[in-house]
Amino acid sequence: MVSKKIIIIGTTASNLYGFRKDFILSCLAQNYHVYAFVSEYTSEWLEKIKSLGVTLVTYKLSRGGLNPLADLGSTFQLIKKIKEIQPDIVFSYSTKPVIYATLAAYRTKVPYIYGMIEGL
């Protein structure tokens, strides 16, 4: 049986592990192949995320940056990576990942796209 693929896109590895760990484990329990995208990380947090059994993907994103060209570059990078994986679902959280990952997922025709702005 071919498992479905889900991409979870956030910013920091520590945030992904701390706040999305249960969600990741739930997806894995339902036989999803989970790809975790992070833009800020240390080797310690990368190892913790890998230990969950996910495929870890890093990408460039300036969380506080105001350069539209850099953000456009991040969007194109996400488009390329999402196109390679061909997921069934993209779930993003935090402001910039929701904006740019949603555009990238729509551009690559991902069937199910979800974005969650934290704190709302």
Predicted feature locations:
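N-terminal strand-loop element at the rim of the active site
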Residues: 3, 8-70
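Active-site proximal beta-strand in glycosyltransferases
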Residues: 5-7, 106-120
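Nucleotide-sugar donor phosphate/pyrophosphate-binding loop at the beta->alpha transition
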Residues: 18-19, 69-76, 111-112, 120
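Helix C-cap/helix->beta junction micro-motif
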Residues: 30, 52, 85, 108-109
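An amphipathic, basic-hydrophobic alpha-helix
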Residues: 60-89, 99-107
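Short His-centered aromatic/hydrophobic patch
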Residues: 92-98, 117
